[in-house]
Regions:
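Aromatic, loop-rich ligand-recognition surfaces of beta-strand-rich domains
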Residues: 34-59, 125
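Short, surface-exposed beta-strand/strand-loop-strand elements in extracellular ectodomains
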Residues: 61-77, 121-123
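Short Trp-Ser/Thr-centered turn/loop motifs at beta-strand boundaries
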Residues: 24, 29-45, 71, 83
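Noncatalytic modules at the cell exterior or secretory-pathway interfaces
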Residues: 48-55, 100-118
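Short, intrinsically disordered N-terminal pre-domain segments
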Residues: 1-20, 122-126
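Solvent-exposed serine/threonine-rich low-complexity stretches and specific carbohydrate-binding patches
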Residues: 24, 80-91
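Exposed aromatic-hydrophobic patches
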Residues: 36-41, 93-101
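Solvent-exposed, low-complexity segments and loops of surface/extracellular structural proteins
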Residues: 2, 30-31, 41, 62, ...
């Protein structure tokens, strides 16, 4: 698991954009993993935006708890849970969630629990 670091600026997404914050090349998406973060730009005068999260596992992940983390500052300890945790995947081992009122400036995924050793691709879209 990569160590969380904010040495380099994060990818920035605006409404209509998406970014991969974890790929299979990053290794297994294991319990306790935090993905890379993204910066979210405002889409005009609106102060809150939409954000969607898609996690595609290479196989059955077992028991999962995936949590969108958001923050107004890019400080690891300032990230907080946004909405309810994702606890299920579909028949293709894909988990997806939408968040309608995100006002934070940064977002990432916390894989609180993943019981099977599987790789994944994680995408965040505005």
């Amino acid at each position: 698991m990569p160590t969380y670091a904010n040495t380099f600026p994060p990818y920035c997404i605006a409404p209509g954009d998406q970014a991969q914050v974890w790929t299979s090349a990053d290794g297994n998406l294991a319990s306790g993993t935090k993905t890379q973060r993204i910066a979210i730009t405002a889409g005009g005068p609106a102060t809150r935006g939409r954000l969607s999260l898609r996690v595609s596992f290479s196989g059955a992940p077992g028991v999962i708890s995936l949590q969108l983390h958001t923050s107004d500052t890019d400080v690891d300890t300032d990230y907080n849970n946004e909405g309810a945790a994702i606890a299920a995947v579909n028949a293709s081992n894909v988990a997806r969630a939408e968040y309608a009122n995100v006002a934070a400036k940064f977002a990432r995924l916390l894989a609180t629990t993943v019981t099977n050793a599987v790789t994944a691709t994680v995408e965040l879209a505005a």
